[in-house]
A protein has these predicted regions:
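Beta->alpha turn/N-cap motifs
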Residues: 30-34, 68-73, 82-94, 118, ...
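Ligand-binding cleft/hinge of the Venus flytrap
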Residues: 40, 54-63, 141-159, 188-193, ...
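Short helix-initiation/N-cap motifs at beta->coil->alpha
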Residues: 51, 66-77, 157-171, 205
């Protein structure tokens, strides 16, 4: 009988130890100024597409997270210093950044898109040559449109942010606009009355956002990749995407 109690106690301790290990908490850094990916709500809490994604991954992998609003300037250094375990902040995966951090599998396709009124005849980037086009100043969209129309073209109208640019499109100040696909999709979802549509173009370079961890942290990286695969497979990713953007859920390399 005594041996049975010892065995039972050992089993309980093993289960308790396993449960404790599974509930590890990771500190997550995210910027609070890139709507709809991450931004502060009225309660000063972080929310957005990225925030929902990392929460879903944490749930799928049975770990906890502590979210901290982290300014973009110096965000990568927080991994090296150990102040953050994970950063997710609309970070484009590039070869240069891969030298500093390790990235998860891509979780969002980052590319440009043309935005026009629903009745527009614009069908491609090339067809913007005869149009007045809005871009966000010094953005990727600005670079792309400048290549088509010429950097000093008077047909390019530059704005400080996407909402200003798309309001001008609504008021017929420009015939088309080019911007980050996630940002413009979110705007269109928030303002269906403006009746905009997106026009893709194969010439827009497709890049991807990734979740970053400190160089060499293979254990945490494996958890992130495993969790991402799980939420894609069970439909959680699609639900989150639908909430912030639309029903055209992209295929991802993780699939």
């Amino acid at each position: 009988m005594f041996r049975k109690w010892i065995q039972a106690g050992c089993l309980f301790a093993a289960f308790a130890s396993s449960a404790f290990a599974a509930q590890e908490t990771y500190v997550v850094g995210a910027g609070g100024t890139y709507r709809p990916f991450e931004f502060e709500n009225s309660q000063k809490q972080l929310e957005g597409f990225d925030i929902d994604i990392i929460k879903a991954i944490a749930k799928a992998e049975n770990f906890n997270i502590k979210l901290i609003n982290t300014p973009w300037e110096g965000i990568f250094a927080t991994l090296g210093s150990g102040d953050r375990d994970i950063i997710i902040s609309g970070i484009t995966i590039t070869d240069k950044r891969k030298q500093m951090v390790d990235f998860s599998a891509p979780y969002f396709p980052a590319e440009q898109s043309i935005v026009v009124p629903a009745t527009s005849k614009v069908t491609s980037l090339a067809s913007l040559k005869d149009e007045k086009v809005g871009v966000v100043n010094s953005s990727t969209g600005d670079i792309v449109v400048s290549d088509v129309l010429g950097k000093n073209s008077t047909a390019i109208k530059r704005f400080d942010n996407t909402p200003l640019m798309l309001q001008e499109l609504f008021e017929d100040g420009v015939s088309a606009a080019v911007g980050d696909v996630g940002v413009v999709k979110y705007y269109i979802k928030q303002h269906p009355e403006k009746q905009f549509k997106l026009v893709p173009d194969a010439k827009f370079e497709r890049q991807y956002f990734g979740i970053a961890v400190a160089k060499g942290n293979t254990e945490l990286l494996a958890k992130l990749n495993s969790g991402l695969k799980k939420i894609i497979a069970d439909g959680t990713y699609a639900k989150i995407y639908n909430t912030w953007f639309d029903e055209n859920v992209p295929a991802l390399p993780a699939q």
